[in-house]
Amino acid sequence: MLTQVDGLKEKGFWDTLANRLYYALFHAVSAMLICDGREVGSHKGAAIRFHQFYVKTGLFTIEEGSFYSQMETLREKADYNCYFDVTEAEILERIAPTLQLIEKIEQYISDKGY
């Protein structure tokens, strides 16, 4: 999914880019939950568990938890709201934080020995 970022930026496919960034983040969060023996049944469930087990315990910041929730909302609007288009500015400012959060999750998983 992340291999598509540059191509989608070049083409100006902001809605699709929001989708890909969110799903990359969702899959990272899901992998972390699974590695810790927690079930992932839905997008909302993953978000709730991320906040419950990682944000509230201080492993991830409140800002990171909020960012994850914002990315889910942005993706839902981009995918399902016919009257909403993600702007270039909205998505470009979210690329680096998404990649940073994924890297932090990958490090957490790696530190656990997976």
Predicted regions and their residues:
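Terminal alpha-helical segments
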Residues: M1-Y114
